[in-house]
């Protein structure tokens, strides 16, 4: 530990520089796509990562047809050591634009309002985000106000790449076999659909996709997605009595019927699951509502649907 601490003192960390580069590469996934990856542009970041890994001397780094990046470092100790792997996802949420991201570094945060220049009405205030009190003195990175930043999970990608850089620069630091995996399509629930487990020679693994430094989670929820398609009956408004059936009104009634005090993200915590409408669109003639489901017990996923939407 003393050796590593000393090396860290002299090491030029690159995670911030890498992060600022990665977030400018659009990698939004698409829940409506049937391809794998759901968007080809996710491979653009994968190609960058493979090239950087090759430059670090990791010659086995590869990007497969489904958009997964695999790389491994051999053990550098003579005795047998359990393998470990580190994983992060490259895609960003489809809920907000990931194109033309302009990251902004706010240095030495002291509790002041952070105004995002491309939309001055978007202001990050300490009073509205009390967890920021723990970041006094740190640099904070935001988007410019019009896009997603993409810290979920390009922060994890940058951290892993920085760690690989450290290991390759300091082979005197002992370690067992290490596998690196970067995945596509996590944001749309397909991050492991085509993962090649044969390439992961590890007995333990960590996904770097959490919260603040020092926070460790040892379990996660089950997840699912579903969509309700509503077919209405369109008529000229002047002759609609007894004929028109508005798909939009039906969709609104479905949303209104959802629980107000439970089974929703804004009313749950810890291991409480939820059903959450993420998108609604349509017209009088037809409408769609998209939902995500989360539960720590897989069998409860369908239970939340039957409880929340008994008439659908």
Question: Language-model features: where?
Answer:
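Midchain, well-structured core segments that form catalytic/ion-binding scaffolds
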Residues: 138-151, 170, 185-307
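N-terminal capping segment at the start of a domain
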Residues: 2-6, 12-40, 141-142
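Predominant activation on well-ordered alpha-helical scaffold segments within soluble catalytic domains
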Residues: 16, 20, 47-50, 157-165, ...
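Active-site metal-coordination/substrate-binding segment of hydrolases
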Residues: 80-174, 182
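A non-catalytic alpha/beta surface segment that caps or lines the substrate-entry region
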Residues: 34-81, 85-87, 91
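A common structural junction motif
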Residues: 90-91, 260, 309-312
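Short amphipathic alpha-helices in soluble, non-transmembrane regions
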Residues: 86, 303-312
């Amino acid at each position: 530990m003393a050796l590593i601490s000393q090396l860290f003192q002299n090491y030029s960390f690159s995670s911030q520089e890498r992060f600022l580069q990665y977030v400018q590469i659009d990698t939004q996934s698409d829940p409506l796509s049937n391809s794998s990856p759901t968007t080809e542009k996710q491979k653009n970041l994968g190609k960058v990562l493979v090239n950087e890994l090759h430059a670090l001397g990791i010659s086995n780094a590869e990007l497969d047809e489904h958009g997964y990046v695999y790389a491994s470092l051999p053990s550098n100790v003579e005795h047998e050591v359990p393998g470990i792997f580190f994983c992060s996802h490259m895609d960003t949420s489809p809920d907000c634009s990931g194109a033309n991201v302009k990251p902004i570094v706010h240095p030495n945060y002291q509790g002041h309002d952070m105004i995002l220049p491309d939309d001055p009405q978007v202001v990050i205030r300490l009073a509205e985000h009390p967890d920021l009190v723990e970041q006094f003195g740190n640099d904070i990175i935001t988007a410019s106000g019009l896009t997603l930043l993409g810290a979920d999970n390009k922060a994890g990608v940058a951290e892993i790449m920085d760690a690989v850089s450290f290991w390759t620069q300091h082979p005197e630091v002992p370690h067992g076999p290490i596998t690196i995996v970067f995945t596509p399509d996590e944001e749309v629930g397909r991050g492991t659909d085509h993962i090649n487990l044969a390439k992961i020679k590890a007995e333990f693994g960590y996904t770097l996709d959490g919260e603040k430094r020092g926070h460790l989670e040892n379990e996660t929820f089950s997840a699912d997605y579903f969509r309700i398609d509503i077919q209405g009956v369109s008529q000229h408004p002047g002759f609609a009595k007894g004929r028109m059936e508005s798909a939009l009104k039906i969709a609104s009634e479905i949303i209104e019927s959802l629980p107000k005090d439970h089974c929703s993200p804004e009313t749950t915590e810890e291991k409480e699951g939820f059903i959450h409408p993420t998108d609604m669109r349509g017209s009088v003639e037809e409408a769609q509502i998209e939902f995500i489901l989360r539960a720590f017990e897989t069998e409860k996923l369908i239970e939340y649907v039957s409880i929340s939407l008994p008439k659908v």
